[in-house]
Amino acid sequence: MGCLACHHTDRCVIKDDINSIIDKLVESELIVFGVPNYFDNVSGLFKNFMDRLHPLYKSKQLKNKNVIFIYVGGGEENGTKKELHQAINGFCKYLSLDIKKEFSFRALNIDEVNKQKEKIKEILNNIKNMSSI
């Protein structure tokens, strides 16, 4: 919509569930985002979600909030992480989020991520360790 009404209210004026999602993000100690890679960028849906968090830009309610990103794409893991990090870095800069860790999965087919047990274990351990900070 791009109306910028949130600059005056610190809330989105669109009547849907984004304000309750924002409240949950603000209350969280740690935020974990799962981000698919489409054509070396975040998916359109995730980009829409990022844009809907615009009320948090001016209010800085997420300042220094710890964030973990989990990327999934069909290319090499490091390539996916590199490409998505660029888009995510700007998002985090403007919302003053603190990226604590980034993980990347290579997966093209349904259930391919679930077969990567060691990586899942590593991510869960990182989340457990961070949530005790």
Show where each model-derived region lies.
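A generic structural signal for short
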Residues: 9-10, 76-77, 127
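Helix-loop-strand module that forms the ligand-binding subsite of alpha/beta enzymes
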Residues: 13-95
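A short, structure-level motif marking secondary-structure boundaries and short turns
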Residues: 5-7, 72-75, 117
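Short secondary-structure transition/capping segments
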Residues: 1, 45-46, 112-115
